[in-house]
Amino acid sequence: MASSTFFSDWNQMLKPRVTSLVLATIIPGLYLASEQSPSGFLIAITLFGTFLMSSASFIFNQVIEKDRDAKMKRTSNRPIPSGRISVVQATLVGIAMMGSSFYVLAVYVNLLTALCAFAALISYVFLYTIFLKPRTTQNIVIGGVAGCVGPLIGYAAIGNSLPVQAWSLFMMIFLWTPAHFWALAIFLKEEYSDADFPMLPVVKGIHQTTKSIFFYTILYSIACVSFYFLESSMGFLYLIVSLIVCIWMGILSYQLIQNPEPQSARKFFFFSILHLFIINITIVVDHLI
């Protein structure tokens, strides 16, 4: 039982399911930046190093937000607010993972890759968690930069540079992030209110939030389709798939305006995750064929 609790607690601290989406956004850059398929070792070490840095970010986030987490039903049983893991323990593990990540990426990949991953951590912990999230409804718009670094890491790992295609994928995720998290904030509105987080549904109301979700969904869809014209290796497979899933996401966002209920927001939230996975997988498949 003790070992089961240990693994469950650290699973909550490290958030591997969330990190898997970050890792998925690295893979297109690894393939697009290389004339030949990257080596298995380079792929593995880049993903492993990024996993460590992402996990460290989530640990520091939970250390900082422990008091607010205790006020939210969804987070009150997390290891730190419930007392199963101490702040000191979590901080030391976070520092160790952060340092290990930087070393692994700098030594076995290159310094630019390590700096990109570290910049994501700094952005998430300081810009988003400490400064923006408790202060503004636009917290996720600006603070979402941290979750967009995957493509930069992928391109940097192969070419030791950040070409325009890397930044276009960065911008794609940047535009995806607000709609995704505002949908989450709709069906967790009361909990965010209890924890005093000024999320958009709490401050501006659900109707305004659904209109903002629709607006960012359109911008994100334009960015997805535009990548076909920016990346010469993209073929009709990517164009067709991106058009189909973007149209469907647009329909869901419009339905959310018409029916702004938590269940509709939840449906949009989970589809947005699937959408980003599909886009990234299609980029790689189209490039390889």
Curated annotation (Swiss-Prot):
Topology in membrane: Multi-pass membrane protein
Gene Ontology MF: a single term: protoheme IX farnesyltransferase activity
GO biological-process terms attached to the record: heme biosynthetic process; heme O biosynthetic process
Pathway(s) this gene product operates in, as recorded in its UniProt entry: Porphyrin-containing compound metabolism; heme O biosynthesis; heme O from protoheme: step 1/1
Function: Converts heme B (protoheme IX) to heme O by substitution of the vinyl group on carbon 2 of heme B porphyrin ring with a hydroxyethyl farnesyl side group.
TM segment ranges: 18-38, 40-60, 87-107, 111-131, 139-159, 168-188, 212-232, 234-254, 269-289
Protein name per UniProt: Protoheme IX farnesyltransferase
Any single Gene Ontology cellular-component annotation: plasma membrane
EC number: 2.5.1.141
